[in-house]
């Protein structure tokens, strides 16, 4: 019986065709409309920032990849179908009137164009959509260069693994998928059109079907052979759980690698066997070849390596893996910037008893002991510096350093007083108010981290609050900028807080003759402002207004009269997100901080270039390696991204006023950065363009440091056998604070310069490391942020059993005097006691000092109204506890008179801290000031003149001699006490008293 005549499709009426056309257009608009709107908005936004070349390069790359892959995959699938159709048998017998294949064949023939063209088009489009997301690999392949370092196994430059190998694997994957889809399409086509018949005892296979299917099957095997070849190189970055390191181990090199070559040879032989069926017309040979390939993959590819691993490697693992562990140690150190050029190890052992004079002489550290914990004092900033309900400080503040009035380096707790739209109330939430009136924050607030205003000897006394330096727009419209650096423009239109709400846009620009944006208040009126920065996308024309109305689903863009021809819209206001948008190849640090640079407020963002296939380098997950108690507390975690290479290659700044993004090359030797600078020329400025003012505020980034300290815990070990046994590993300590739930965070401090190893002050990022699975200290790590030694890591290795952070905190918190005093403050005076960050500080010669500030806040909650103040300072040195209201008191209790001679002075307090408010009003928590004679409320009284917190100072010759006398008198008193000579002891005490008087009177 022949083929049935094809049934014709019923004709559609004109009305039906019109309705279908309208429906298709509506669906396309729903699918493509938002994408087209976003594309146009991005085109405007990138152009406003000056990075339109980034947008066009990425868009063009994605489009080209999409078109090429879609056409290639679609064409291959179409060819498989077309060949099956063109070579179909003329006569196709059927199994009867109910033959299901015949019914399917009839359906396909009736809709031949739909199936013959629609299916390949759909598959091609789907493949193109997936492929365009790999534009990064394609651009790196096109622009990547050499590392100048070769791998230890194949001798290939590391640029091959970073830039070439991922592209080859991508191409091979798509060729394999395309060939497989063509095979399936061809197989189904021949089955439907009669080239393959399964009826009868043996079935039938047409010559055309045999040739086409065998050709495609052979091609798949050839591609598999190429895959085996590439698998060899990928062994160098594999992370099998059986190994304590990343990369190829003994089993991989001596079993898996030869197995890959054997499998490659078998695949080639099988491909020849399969192609031979084109001539021999015997399908048993290719079937045997395919079976051989499958069997070999089980026996050679899996069985042999398993036998080698179990019976050769495991009984002698330390010796067998030693060579490969050495490779991993060297590669990991280079990939994460932990080579000898960067890291200096020094033995740090306390060789004698530390004296008061030695501690006092270590003035770079003792004069800068940090008292303000940026994770605790935010409520105090809010209480005394908020000013208005819609201003806000983040829960965790930042640390930066500036040169103090005395010319010495000093660290500050810094914060920008940003606008928080979520805190607007009642009518303030109206669309006009939210987006055109309340548009910006106002003020840069800094507090010296090493001092507080006043001493709280008694819990009922005022004192212990931060000393605020507020750069704000004052009541007369002029900028008040007392420090820590001059600031010309304190208004903040861009920042992480202001952007942390849905639809964070602001509409700015003058409409008419009046200013609309809220700025500040005088005693009698509210003053408004009009944004004058260059940032913002113009929305004065109806096209842009319509586009943004659609983007934000807000009709007021079309109907509100507050939008005029000079109006602009500010959006995408998060600094880190702006950097990631203009540099999509960067991973940004989770910590973004404000700084005053050249009289402008900028947000500084650290950017990383990363790889995940660096040969033999440890594979690390950023989210787990960077997690600590601070990150967990605010749910600010790094991306869940695996890396085996990382560089802080870019420093970025985002202007807080106009949103300008500037990228600077920090590591110009980074091959990954060089590749991206070739992809996007002109977007990254050279390192030489970093001004000294900006360089003075660049910090060693936290996330990079946390990744490095986690790796240093293992990769400080040189001996591969010791590495394998893990007997000399270290651990990142848990945060000992009772409210913490993760690892102890690193801390920025100003202290003695460990790179230069002298008494000069240095801004550094520090962390302690414990012994493996023990609470004793193993090492102290410091990363320098000073311009001349930036990026240098110093590791002090600590012998013996020195208390780690947990043991130190337990010793302090359980000390009888400490617990009793805090019990009185907390229980009897109804205060909530909070322990601040436990700092570990190298002091004197080989000594380690633990310092923990203690805060008290009214009530028992963490509410913003329960603002904390410093109530005590607790210290531990060896097994001795020092405790008191001030640093000087605690040092004196630990080391004796004179130890706190160079410690931070306390700023005098007259009640609570000065409350700088730009609008001339008192914060809500403060009592209202008395009225003036005319009945108007008086302005807040000016803050009392506070003594400048003392930074590291140069001691005069007279004071140095007095310190020597102090040390001599202390030594004599201790010797007399041990010998029981009370007469000599009394004389020594008198000399000590005289030495103290001499020190106090010395100039």
Swiss-Prot record:
Q: What is this protein called?
A: UPF0182 protein MSMEG_1959/MSMEI_1915
The family note in this entry says: Belongs to the UPF0182 family.
Its predominant location is membrane
Annotated GO CC locations: extracellular region; plasma membrane
Give TM segment ranges.
Answer: 18-38, 63-83, 114-134, 176-196, 211-231, 260-280, 288-308
Membrane topology classification: Multi-pass membrane protein
Listed InterPro entries: UPF0182 (IPR005372)
Q: Where in the cell is it found?
A: Cell membrane
What is the originating organism of this protein?
Answer: Mycolicibacterium smegmatis (strain ATCC 700084 / mc(2)155) (Mycobacterium smegmatis)
The organism's place on the tree of life at top rank:
Bacteria
List UniProt keywords, sorted A-Z: Cell membrane, Membrane, Transmembrane, Transmembrane helix
Question: Which stretches of sequence are listed as region Disordered?
Answer: 902-960
